Amino acid sequence: MKKFKRRLSLTLRGSQTIDESLSELAEQMTIEENSSKDNEPIVKNGRPPTSHSMHSFLHQYTGSFKKPPLRRPHSVIGGSLGSFMAMPRNGSRLDIVHENLKMGSDGESDQASGTSSDEVQSPTGVCLRNRIHRRISMEDLNKRLSLPADIRIPDGYLEKLQINSPPFDQPMSRRSRRASLSEIGFGKMETYIKLEKLGEGTYATVYKGRSKLTENLVALKEIRLEHEEGAPCTAIREVSLLKDLKHANIVTLHDIVHTDKSLTLVFEYLDKDLKQYMDDCGNIMSMHNVKLFLYQILRGLAYCHRRKVLHRDLKPQNLLINEKGELKLADFGLARAKSVPTKTYSNEVVTLWYRPPDVLLGSSEYSTQIDMWGVGCIFFEMASGRPLFPGSTVEDELHLIFRLLGTPSQETWPGISSNEEFKNYNFPKYKPQPLINHAPRLDSEGIELITKFLQYESKKRVSAEEAMKHVYFRSLGPRIHALPESVSIFSLKEIQLQKDPGFRNSSYPETGHGKNRRQSMLF
């Protein structure tokens, strides 16, 4: 009977039906691109592919832990109930491990979970590790499922699922991984609780929410779907870009929930945006904090630009900040990947105050430098406490720009004299004014850097990568430049926020501020 149970425990259970109703859009978010080659699991020792049930998912995700998996000799596969030889580690001796024969008819042990330090009594009196009862940590599960770095499955959830399975080292198929994520709770609206409305726009409503799975706060961007038109192109664009952008200074897209009536994007929750932060400071920020925020903006942008992704809608409302001071780029609804340099894009893309003059004058051929003008405007706003060019119309915006930086000429902006829109406006001939007169809190290095951002010719604007190396950031130390992309700058002990001079310890009331909050998340 024991031999029969032993044989039965080595067989694999049949596959369960998988719900294939999730859209390809949700699949692309939850499945990493580099796993697309793994259409089916690797067959080991002549076994068929594993099933797609939750139990087999757990089996497949217990292979890469701190200790190497134990390999089963072919004689055991054939039915022998002898001892197993563990693989050696670091040249140490082989440990003898006996199979735990107390198995249920479904091949699962009916004993409680054990850890790698648990011991069982061998018939020969040797103390042995029980290889079946290995405790899987949250880190193990997150790594194997490629979950976002700040998602943590609670310990209680691991215990509830009884994740204690023999180690398997074969990779998981896309199909099986998708089913596993769904069984955990991803892609389901019931996994999230709506707490309060943060804002509402033409196409989307944003809620503050909580994940039942992790107890973490989330931002739920609920996009209404019209049956005639389907998902707005901005939503599709945002999802397609964010699923590939994994960086400490870019907002994390945790999940996608697709129903017949809506598409809900589940983002990490950050308490406020840069506009709210400046309001809380009475628009008088610490210049040290200005430097930290500017560096993080550049760091996130440099990552995007290396991947030929343009944000195209930079503004304080699209820069989210948490309590630590970590700043993250958000709202990629107008962003797009730049694959062909000469490709013509729509020129209706950027909020007016942060729109560069070449776009204001009708240029639709641009590159990553389109974002750098907006960085300069935001830099000035943080340092001075007021918007740099708060124009109400395109003409008014250009008027404010030319009055400060000087009306461009053929010498200062080659080709401008032949621009029809520029000629039609017939602007007065303004002379440039010293920027230090308008931002007296900036030092000479800061003035030099902001000047590099505010160049009429887009190709002359400093890149995000180059700006990070500017002498203005020298006081932050050298280690900040060597951080991995996924690591926050606040992981360095020398990087800390300072108290802002104008900070007032006040917050928005519980109600009445929804329309002013998180406008960055709306279409």
Curated annotation (Swiss-Prot):
Domain of life: Eukaryota
Biological processes per GO annotation: protein phosphorylation; regulation of cell cycle phase transition
Keywords for the protein's UniProt record, in alphabetical order: ATP-binding, Kinase, Nucleotide-binding, Phosphoprotein, Serine/threonine-protein kinase, Transferase
Function: May play a role in terminally differentiated neurons. Has a Ser/Thr-phosphorylating activity for histone H1.
Pfam family, one: Pkinase
Stated name of the protein: Cyclin-dependent kinase 17
Residues reported to bind ATP: 198-206, 221
GO molecular function: ATP binding; cyclin-dependent protein serine/threonine kinase activity; protein kinase activity; protein serine kinase activity
Family matches, as Gene3D superfamilies: Phosphorylase Kinase, domain 1 (3.30.200.20), Transferase(Phosphotransferase) domain 1 (1.10.510.10)
Modified residues annotated as Phosphoserine in this record: 9, 80, 92, 105, 137, 146, 165, 180
Compositional bias (Basic residues): 514-523
Primary gene name: CDK17
Species of provenance: Homo sapiens
Listed InterPro entries: CDK, Kinase-like_dom_sf, Prot_kinase_dom, Protein_kinase_ATP_BS, Ser/Thr_kinase_AS
Coiled coil: none
Location of the region described as Disordered in the Swiss-Prot/TrEMBL record: 30-55, 103-123, 501-523
Keyword Ion transport included in the entry's annotation: no
EC number: 2.7.11.22
Gene Ontology cellular component terms for the protein in this record: cytoplasm; nucleus
Similarity annotation: Belongs to the protein kinase superfamily. CMGC Ser/Thr protein kinase family. CDC2/CDKX subfamily.
Catalysed reactions, semicolon-separated: L-seryl-[protein] + ATP = O-phospho-L-seryl-[protein] + ADP + H(+); L-threonyl-[protein] + ATP = O-phospho-L-threonyl-[protein] + ADP + H(+)
Top class in the EC scheme: transferase
